[in-house]
From Swiss-Prot, chain A:
Keywords: Cytoplasm, Nucleus, Phosphoprotein. Belongs to the IPI1/TEX10 family. PANTHER family: REGULATOR OF MICROTUBULE DYNAMICS PROTEIN, TESTIS-EXPRESSED PROTEIN 10. One of its GO terms (cellular component) is nucleolus. The keyword Protein biosynthesis does not apply. It comes from Mus musculus (Mouse). HEAT repeats lie at residues 99-137. Component of some MLL1/MLL complex, at least composed of the core components KMT2A/MLL1, ASH2L, HCFC1/HCF1, WDR5 and RBBP5, as well as the facultative components BACC1, CHD8, E2F6, HSP70, INO80C, KANSL1, LAS1L, MAX, MCRS1, MGA, KAT8/MOF, PELP1, PHF20, PRP31, RING2, RUVB1/TIP49A, RUVB2/TIP49B, SENP3, TAF1, TAF4, TAF6, TAF7, TAF9 and TEX10. Component of the 5FMC complex, at least composed of PELP1, LAS1L, TEX10, WDR18 and SENP3; the complex interacts with methylated CHTOP and ZNF148. Component of the PELP1 complex, composed of at least PELP1, TEX10 and WDR18. This is Testis-expressed protein 10. It comes from the Eukaryota. The modification Phosphothreonine is found at residue 29.
Swiss-Prot record, chain B:
This is WD repeat-containing protein 18. Gene3D superfamilies: YVTN repeat-like/Quinoprotein amine dehydrogenase. WD repeats lie at residues 36-75, 78-116, 119-158, 170-211, 213-257, 267-306. InterPro entries: G-protein_beta_WD-40_rep, WD40/YVTN_repeat-like_dom_sf, WD40_repeat_CS, WD40_repeat_dom_sf, WD40_rpt, WDR18/Ipi3/RID3, Wdr18_C_dom. Component of the 5FMC complex, at least composed of PELP1, LAS1L, TEX10, WDR18 and SENP3; the complex interacts with methylated CHTOP and ZNF148. Interacts with NOL9. Component of the PELP1 complex, composed of at least PELP1, TEX10 and WDR18. The complex interacts with pre-60S ribosome particles. Keywords: Cytoplasm, Developmental protein, Nucleus, Repeat, WD repeat.
């Protein structure tokens, strides 16, 4: 039983009931685990020879994958290539030829993803490859590009534009070299040639018509917009490239082209004199080849297509003939004549964009034609062929406005905007109108003014209103606007109209807070008008009132501008300088009025601006009609204060000398310019180096480390900073020269003397630089005709002693003042040699019994040095008794203590130079 | 005949004893003096080797002396205003004078005032002709230097504004002196200015070749004939030498401790007003406001001689003495005409005399020379006679012509055959 039961246990039948879950079998396979495939994206092998990317594929593998039939492989190869090249940029140089040939080949790939990857790779590569590196491969690149542009598949055509964008951005010079093919491609992108037989015989301009392709993803208008945007970019690059070669003309292209800087040499005389700079003016004598030559034996960019691009007027004419009818068609499509009636309320965004691109292309074509057109034949041809068309289509509804988009259509427009954001994200109806005016105005000239007066008048009104409207214009709009105005002014003989235009520009100029580029443009515009006016001869010269008001306001503006905007100040100074050198009366009058502000030593433009502008301002002084005393005193402050730089200060003194009555020929005295008194007082105050206030302030200084005091001299020395000292010294040189060249030497010496005795004698604290400079000037000016004022001598003697005392007590460690030593010693000794009476007075003042014991060694050393100095020896000899007396006094004072070294030296020197002299002892003996 | 003597012509502003003195360059011997008036700066000119012209300082006339009759003032040319500078064309046909801001151009043979150029905005300070007289350069206190072509100035119609060939506006302060180099229209012009620079320009291209910046305003400039050096006189009396040709090969050999002093002539105490170099380039003459004229050896930079005058030196120049200067028997080939004060054509009675004065060069030869028609006939005769002679000389000619025609025919045939053959070849595969 048990056995049976047991067996029953073993093979118990499981009863399955409806509604209950089936119990799991014990031997059922568990299927609840999850599996994952092991994915090995990278090879384990490590190639040591070539760098690899993340997937361990080297450049050869990747390039060979490019030939794979599958789009996915190609795409991944392109991505891998990008990865590899970003990690190892040096591969680019090594394999450029292979990379480019493979990458450009897939511009025409059927798979959109592959093309996208190729474009991305190109985008990545382009900034890394320089123009001269890619130029040998550029024929290949452009061949692939043009095959993509002319491809039958629309997608490839669209993507080719992206490639073109990249190339235009990075290699404008190279791509414009292939213009003959590319321009044709552009035309073919938006149109097709009529091949029907009836049209064959007609001229080619009619044989192209706009094409509509229903298969495109975008509307044909958007497509055209895209193509036209690229075309205008391309033409822009072309125009830029050619304007670099030719001399630019007009306000738009006023890039700073420094006149012939390439071959003119600028050198500094000092460098040349030191043989640091050699001059080689004549090219044939040069031993070095001229390396900056642009000449190439082989023409790399354009192989045999030179005769077809737009560089010749004939080809340009041909292209214009093809493209302009197409553009007009585009315009009509964007703005159908039946809708045009309602144009007053505005044009919608998208047509406006098309219109703008159309006008852009035309204006660029005009610009190109102007660059090539020397004889104005092209201009008249353009006028003949297109004026009527343009007038009819463009001008009939001239000022175009943007229509505000209504709410219901917002969704729609958003979508279209998304397409167009690449091209131009904001539509600028003002720019559109201005471009149109530019195009139209360039078709007219002075001789045809009669016929065109109606539409010219419209444009003029529009321009004037825009200028006066006070709207915020950006520099691009303003550039166009001023270009149109300039052209209008040029061809308009009528003065009132011109005056109105200038006035309108002036109202714009008067606005506050204009941006610098805008302000610069306006200034350039005015200066151009001014120069044009000045070119006319006197009879025909007509002074525009607004213009002269503008010009007259410049000095005041400059003075108010201060240091806020140095660039603007530079421009203003340039114009003022030009006008002043041309002796423009209004300007000079205003400059005179503003001079006190400009040349203010505290915050005038002359001290706050950078050095370049300072120099121009200093030069401007030459042209001032009069130099009154107050201006001169300011200028002398400017010179002294050291904010002008010593070389510039010297220049200033030189210029003033040139304007003074002493430089000219005797007859040409301009007495109204600057009186001699003012000039001399300028020189003297510059010589002093300190203003009266500063000097009086100095008088109260005592016991400061900067003041040197001795017990033997009433004059205290104020020690100046080394910088100030050297600056003062440099200026003194210039002042000295100015004084020296005054013909009546004795008179100028007298004036200098009386000035010193009036302003400096009686002061107790004197700056060391002032004392030194006065000595220097007196030494240089003194000659046999001059009579020295008696009252001056004691002052000079005490100054001299103070200086010498200062020099002898200088400590070795004081590096700053040590540099002064040689200069000061030289002037002191020379003044003592030139004026023996000063020496005598100084020796007399050495009452050693009043001196402090510390000062005695200094006096001893001084006497020894004076004795040793050869030029002074004879004078010392005449004062031998005095010297002997002083030495005797010192010896008695020192007798108590031990004989020191300096005293021994002094005794020795005295005995050698004076007692040893043949006459010396006899005189002494006679006296004793 | 010996080489012409080099002499120095000087004037000073005082003019106490004489207004102009001529002395021999090397010996310093006084040769001639001219009396009357004070010559102004840059106002001395030699006309055609026969007359000496001196613009008077601050006065509105020009003195003219015959070169050999030194003591006698020949003529006073009245001008509309004080003359600031004066020059004459090298061929002696024109006189240029700067009067205020205008340039006056006279024709010497008639004395007519041909043109008044007013492109300067302030006083003209110096005027120079190029060596061949085809161009002249003017510079003024308005910082501008203008290069004019004489032809275009003379031919322009009065209605149009006369434009200079080049406008050089890089100077920023008044130009004080200019020197025109050798080479006619290819010459280089050096200008000196108070803005402390000396600039060198090319007349042919109008380019700025060189600009040298100094420490002081430059008041005079000159070049030697070979244009190896520019000499620049500074406002403090130093004269600087700028070498235009560097010799890179020499740089290793030249070790001179005092190199930087080797390019300055020091001696004058006031601004140098005029400079001149002798034709061999070895001697430099300088005149200064310190009332002295100095002669320097260019190579060693030493002062050879100092001549002290009575006033600031206004003009000093080394010239080759024209034969008339030293020959008392010499008479000028042309009497100096009366110089007109008014522009030709603007005068009232001008049409009456001016109408018939159209000169045609070579007119006096017309009688002797055959006309062009006659010449043509002559030429034809010569040609035909030559042809006839050839024909007669060789009877072969017709035969030769025949031969050649035959050859042409055969060549044509071959060409046609070739064409047929090739078309056959080409068209076969399409068959």
């Amino acid at each position: 039983m048990t056995k049976k039961r047991k067996r029953q246990d073993d093979f118990q039948k499981v009863k399955l009931k409806v509604g209950k879950k089936k119990p799991k079998l014990e031997n059922a396979t568990a299927t609840n685990f999850k599996t994952k495939a092991i994915h090995l994206p990278e090879q384990l092998k490590e190639d040591r020879t070539l760098p690899t990317n993340n997937r361990k594929l080297n450049i050869k593998d990747l390039l060979s994958q490019m030939h794979h039939y599958s789009g996915g492989v190609k795409q991944s190869a392109l991505l891998g290539l990008k990865d590899l090249l970003s990690q190892y940029p040096f591969i680019i140089d090594a394999h450029l030829s292979n990379i480019l040939s493979e990458v450009t080949a897939v511009f025409t790939d059927r798979d959109a993803n592959v093309r996208l990857a190729a474009v991305q790779l190109l985008q990545f590569l382009a900034p890394k490859i320089r123009t001269e590196h890619i130029s040998p491969f550029f024929p290949l690149v452009s061949a692939h590009l043009s095959s993509a542009m002319t491809h039958i598949t629309e997608g490839i055509q669209e993507d080719s534009l992206k490639v073109l964008d990249i190339l235009l951005e990075h290699y404008p010079a190279l791509i414009t070299g292939r213009s003959s093919i590319l321009l044709k491609n552009f035309v073919e992108l938006i149109s097709h040639q009529q091949l029907s037989k009836g049209l064959v015989n007609r001229d080619r301009s009619q044989s192209w018509i706009l094409s509509v392709n229903p298969n495109r993803r975008v509307t044909s208008q958007q497509w055209r917009l895209k193509v036209l945007a690229r075309l205008s970019k391309f033409l822009q690059a072309l125009a830029d490239g050619s304007s670099r070669l030719r001399e630019s003309e007009g306000l738009q292209e006023q890039k700073e082209t420094p006149h012939a800087t390439s071959n003119s040499i600028f050198i500094n005389w000092k460098d040349h004199a030191n043989d640091q700079q050699q001059i080689q003016v004549y090219e044939n004598g040069g031993s070095q080849p001229n390396v900056s030559s642009q000449f190439r034996l082989r023409c790399l960019g354009t192989l045999g297509t030179v005769d077809e691009d737009l560089s010749s007027p004939e080809n340009l004419k041909g292209f214009i003939e093809i493209i302009i009818p197409l553009l007009i068609e585009c315009w009509i499509e964007a703005l159908p004549p039946q809708l045009a009636a309602s144009v007053g309320s505005g044009v919608e965004r998208e047509p406006l964009q098309v219109m703008q691109q159309v006008l852009n292309v035309i204006s660029l074509l005009w610009k190109l034609s102007k660059q090539q057109d020397e004889t104005h034949t092209l201009e008249s041809w353009l006028r003949k062929n297109y004026l009527t068309d343009f007038k009819h289509h463009f001008m009939s509804h001239f000022p175009y406005a943007l229509k505000e988009i209504t709410k219901q259509r917002k969704k729609d427009t958003n979508k279209s905007i998304k397409h167009c954001t690449v091209l131009s994200n904001n539509v600028d109806h003002l720019l559109l109108n201005l471009t149109l005016s530019d195009i139209m105005v360039s078709l007219a000239n002075a001789s045809t003014l009669q016929n065109d007066s109606s539409w010219i008048e419209t444009i003029r009104k529009f321009v004037t209103e825009t200028l006066k409207g006070g709207t915020r214009l950006n520099s691009k709009q303003l550039n166009r606007l001023l270009g149109v105005s300039w052209r209008l002014i040029q061809m308009q003989p009528n003065r009132d109209a011109t005056e109105n235009l200038i006035k309108a520009v002036y109202t714009l100029y008067q606005q506050r807070g204009l941006l610098l580029p805008v302000r610069t443009l306006l200034i350039k515009f005015f200066s151009k008008i001014y120069q044009k006016e000045e070119l006319r001869s006197y009879r025909l010269r007509y002074r525009s009132k607004v213009l002269s008001r503008w010009l007259a306001g410049l000095p005041l503006q400059l003075s108010y501008l201060g240091s806020r905007n140095p660039e603007l100040s530079t421009q203003l100074i340039d114009i003022i300088h030009t006008a002043a050198s041309q002796a423009n009366k209004d300007l000079l009058k205003n400059l005179q009025a503003a001079a006190l502000r400009i040349y203010d030593p505290q915050e005038g433009a002359v001290v706050v601006l950078p050095a370049e502008s300072q120099q121009r301002l200093v030069q401007l002084l030459y042209f001032l009609p009069t130099l009154p005393a107050d201006l001169l005193s300011q200028l002398s402050r400017c010179c002294i204060m050291g904010r002008l730089g010593s070389s510039l200060a010297v220049t200033l003194i030189g210029i003033l000398y040139m304007r003074s009555s002493f430089s000219g020929w005797s007859h040409s005295v301009n007495d109204c310019l600057m009186t001699d008194v003012d000039y001399l007082s300028f020189l003297f105050s510059t010589l002093t180096g300190f203003s009266k206030e500063e000097l009086t302030w100095l008088q109260n200084l005592r016991g400061v480390p900067h003041v040197v005091q001795t017990s033997l001299s009433p004059v205290l020395l104020y020690l100046t900073d080394l910088d100030q000292f050297l600056h003062h010294w440099d200026i003194t040189e210039a002042v000295c020269h100015s004084l020296l060249v005054i013909p009546a030497r004795s008179q100028s010496f007298d004036i200098m003397q009386s000035a010193i005795s009036k302003h400096l004698v009686g002061l107790t604290v004197i700056p060391d630089s002032t004392a030194g400079c006065i000595f220097g000037v007196m030494c240089k000016l003194l000659d046999h005709t001059c009579v020295v004022n008696e009252a001056l001598l004691p002052f000079l003697a005490s100054c001299c002693y103070s200086l010498l005392y200062f020099l002898l007590t200088l400590e070795k460690g004081d590096a700053e003042h040590l540099k002064k030593r040689d200069k000061l010693w030289e002037v002191c000794v020379s003044i003592l040699a030139l004026l023996p009476r000063v020496l005598r007075l100084m020796l007399q003042s050495l009452r050693v019994n009043r001196a402090s014991p510390e000062e005695l060694p200094v006096v001893g050393q001084l006497l020894r040095l004076l004795l040793q100095h050869v030029p002074l020896r004879s004078h010392m000899l005449t004062n031998a008794i005095l010297v002997q007396q002083i030495i005797k006094n010192i010896t008695t004072l020192k007798s108590g203590s031990v004989q020191e070294q300096w005293l021994t030296d002094l005794h020795y020197c005295f005995s050698v130079y004076i007692s040893g002299h043949p006459q010396g002892p006899s005189i002494l003996n006679a006296l004793y | 005949m010996a080489a012409p003597m080099e002499v120095v012509v000087c004037t000073d502003a005082a003019a106490q004893l004489w207004s102009c003195v001529v002395w021999e360059l090397h010996s310093g011997a006084n040769l001639l003096t001219y009396r009357g008036g004070q010559a102004g700066p840059r106002g001395l000119a030699l006309l055609n080797g026969e007359y000496l012209l001196a613009a008077q300082q601050g006065k509105n006339y020009i003195c003219a002396w015959e070169l050999q009759r030194k003591d006698q003032l020949q003529q006073k040319i009245m001008c509309p205003g004080p003359v600031t500078c004066l020059t004459t064309a090298p061929n002696g046909l024109y006189v240029l004078a700067g009067i205020a801001e205008s340039i006056y151009l006279w024709e010497v043979c008639t004395g007519n005032l041909l043109v008044i150029l007013s492109r300067h905005y302030q006083d003209v300070s110096c005027l120079k002709f190029t060596g061949d007289g085809s161009h002249f350069v003017s510079a003024g206190k308005d910082c501008l230097a203008l290069a004019w072509s004489l032809c275009s100035v003379l031919q322009a119609d009065p209605s149009r504004i006369l434009a200079p060939r080049h406008v050089w506006s890089q100077h920023t302060l008044p130009i004080t002196d200019l020197h025109c180099g050798f080479g006619g229209p290819m010459a280089r012009v050096a200008t000196a200015s108070l803005d402390q620079t000396v600039k060198l320009w090319a007349i042919s291209s109008g380019d700025l070749l060189l600009s040298v910046l100094f420490d002081m305003g430059i008041t005079s400039v000159t070049m030697d004939l070979a244009e190896h050096h520019i000499f620049c006189g500074g406002s403090d009396g130093s004269i600087f030498q700028v070498d235009l040709c560097s010799w890179p090969g020499l740089r290793e050999h030249s070790f001179q401790p005092e190199q930087n002093t080797g390019k300055v002539f020091k001696g004058h105490r006031n601004q140098v007003t005029c400079l001149s170099v002798s034709t061999d380039g070895s001697v430099l003459l300088s005149g200064s406001h310190d009332e002295s004229v100095r002669l320097w050896d260019v190579k060693s930079k030493q002062c050879l001689r100092t001549v002290t005058l009575k006033g600031p030196v206004t003009n000093a120049a080394i010239i080759l003495a024209p034969p008339s200067m030293l020959n008392p028997e010499f008479r000028p080939s042309l009497p100096l005409p009366h110089f007109n004060k008014h522009l030709l054509g603007a005068e009232h009675g001008d049409e009456a005399q001016g109408g018939g004065l159209r000169l045609q060069l070579g007119l006096h030869l017309q009688g002797k020379e055959p006309s062009y028609l006659e010449r043509l006939e002559q030429l034809q005769a010569v040609l035909s006679s030559y042809l006839e002679k050839n024909m007669l000389g060789s009877q072969m000619l017709p035969a030769r012509v025949f031969d050649l025609e035959d050859e042409v025919r055969s060549l044509r045939k071959i060409n046609r055959d070739l064409f047929d053959f090739s078309t056959r070849i080409i068209t076969r595969p399409s068959k």
